[in-house]
Amino acid sequence: MDQQKIPQATAKRLPLYYRFIQNLSLSGKQRVSSAELSEAVKVDSATIRRDFSYFGALGKKGYGYNVNYLLSFFRETLDQDDITRVALIGVGNLGTAFLHYNFTKNNNTKIEMAFDVSEEKVGTEIGGIPVYHLDELEERLSNDIQVAILTVPATVAQAVADRLAETSVHGILNFTPARLNVSENIRIHHIDLAVELQTLVYFLKNYPQ
């Protein structure tokens, strides 16, 4: 099936499946059932089977799924052999944490540079990542950088996004409360930690387990 037709909800679950399958492979497990996958990733087995069905016959009834085959399949589907180079804009507490973490569990995703306006941070390295002045954004971003993580104050988020839109960046992971407006050729994922926490608290109060 053409991946353009895969539901976005399914696409968001693929990295979750891939990480668990990686762990299974490392443990030496040869096959896994949808029920086992369901228990591990907390997605019901019917949804897993439906997700997998978009890609054709990945398993056999009564046997389950071959772990090595799934690992190879999802590795190719998720382009795990292609390095995604990332720039981080805003080296505050959250940005600094990202630089130290630098997606150590994702061998194909690397933050390669960061930008800030603080004189104390510009010209230094954090987690081995060079920090440049925000004024150098357009100059420093090469065609290899296609994704940016935005951890700046909300008041300047739109202005920074406008500048990113004029570079090679095609995807923005926005950790600010601001809802950004950019051209259609740029994809934005908004992650508002305060909203996520409020949602969790709401579910805890209204949908007790």
Swiss-Prot record:
GO terms for molecular function: DNA binding; DNA-binding transcription factor activity. The keyword DNA-binding applies. InterPro entries: CoA-bd, NAD(P)-bd_dom_sf, Rex_DNA-bd_C_dom, Tscrpt_rep_Rex, WH-like_DNA-bd_sf, WH_DNA-bd_sf. GO terms for cellular component: cytoplasm. One of its GO terms (biological process) is negative regulation of DNA-templated transcription. It is found in: Cytoplasm. Residues 16-55 bind DNA. Disulfide bonds: none annotated. NAD(+) binds at residues 90-95. Coiled coil: none annotated. Its main location: cytoplasm. Keywords: Cytoplasm, DNA-binding, NAD, Repressor, Transcription, Transcription regulation. Modulates transcription in response to changes in cellular NADH/NAD(+) redox state. Belongs to the transcriptional regulatory Rex family. HAMAP family: Rex. Homodimer. This is Redox-sensing transcriptional repressor Rex. It comes from Bacillus cereus (strain ATCC 14579 / DSM 31 / CCUG 7414 / JCM 2152 / NBRC 15305 / NCIMB 9373 / NCTC 2599 / NRRL B-3711).
